[in-house]
Swiss-Prot record:
This is Nucleoid-associated protein CPS_3743. It comes from Colwellia psychrerythraea (strain 34H / ATCC BAA-681) (Vibrio psychroerythus). Binds to DNA and alters its conformation. May be involved in regulation of gene expression, nucleoid organization and DNA protection. Residues 87-108 are annotated as: Disordered. PANTHER family: NUCLEOID-ASSOCIATED PROTEIN YBAB.
């Protein structure tokens, strides 16, 4: 009886691992757009945190360099935050809302 229960548990773990691998692939293909300055700076980032595109509104070219740098940093940070939200939502759906200890990420 114990053997069957352990086998079933292992099967479930393998299924979850396969689902998580698929979800990670999907997340890597996903793109989000982070914005700053009311959309004057946009950064497109993949789910694996690769920046694909940076867009600057033409009106920024008249402004100072420091402001542009600040807006770029803010847009990148916004994109990172959005990627993390997508990752959390996707992985949370797979784990059935199982709460992990702080700092622990899936997969283990």
């Amino acid at each position: 009886m114990m053997k069957g229960g352990m086998g079933n548990l292992m099967k479930q773990a393998q299924q979850m691992q396969a689902k998580m691998a698929k979800a990670q692939e999907e997340l890597a293909q996903m793109e989000v757009v982070g914005e700053a300055g009311a959309g004057m700076v946009k950064v497109t980032m993949t789910g694996s945190h690769s920046v694909r595109k940076v867009e600057l509104d033409d009106s920024l070219m008249e402004d100072d360099k420091d402001m542009i740098e600040d807006l770029l940093a803010a847009a990148v940070n916004d994109a990172v935050r959005r990627v993390e939200e997508q990752n959390k939502d996707k992985m949370g759906a797979l784990t059935g809302g199982m709460q992990l200890p702080p700092g622990m990420k899936m997969p283990f």
